[in-house]
């Protein structure tokens, strides 16, 4: 799944291991954002309560090429009253992780609205988005193709690289693979921006 980023290159091999990336975790309330964050940090399930403001953690992740990368995550509350604050956190971000509840069909339209709203902000144009389809372990979860259709992923700006990743945050399935895809997209974008600067 994704829009033209299947030709992942070996840019990763040239990346210094000390590099840090600013990542914002967004999504509706109860989608599993904080569960994703703490599963990545502690590699175990942490029982969480709804986030009233934000959580922030620096997490070192070893990617498939054995390089260790630091992600500075900002997990922002998803309640409706907190969503106007999202744009403050996405300013100058390297990537967005948007978590959706694969079981909650009734709120998928609401998730679509918020996803499209945040990616259309001028400062977020071109920022890579990892859509985390959480709770894929549940029998009544939507398929990836259904989620892609309900979120109208094809209607995102052509300048917005994205990847839809099936996950189960409770046991951690799919999270590392998703981060690797996000990392690839970020590196690809940075390379493109550097090339554009040289042409000026």
UniProtKB/Swiss-Prot annotation:
Gene Ontology biological-process annotations: brown fat cell differentiation; intracellular protein transport; vesicle-mediated transport
Alphabetical list of PROSITE patterns matching this protein: ARF
Binding site for GTP: 27-34, 75-79, 134-137
Keyword Lipoprotein annotated: yes
Alphabetized InterPro entries for the sequence: P-loop_NTPase, Small_GTP-bd, Small_GTPase_ARF, Small_GTPase_ARF/SAR
Domain of life where this protein originates: Eukaryota
Gene3D superfamilies per the UniProt record, alphabetical: P-loop containing nucleotide triphosphate hydrolases (3.40.50.300)
Subcellular location: Cell membrane; Cytoplasm; Nucleus, Nucleolus
Effect of residue 34 to N: Inhibits relocalization of CYTH2 to the plasma membrane. Strongly localized in the nucleolus
Keyword terms of this UniProt record: Cell membrane, Cytoplasm, GTP-binding, Lipoprotein, Membrane, Myristate, Nucleotide-binding, Nucleus
Family according to the record: Belongs to the small GTPase superfamily. Arf family.
Quaternary organization: Interacts with CYTH2. Interacts with KPNA2; the interaction is direct. Does not interact with ARL4A.
Protein name: ADP-ribosylation factor-like protein 4A
Organism name: Homo sapiens (Human)
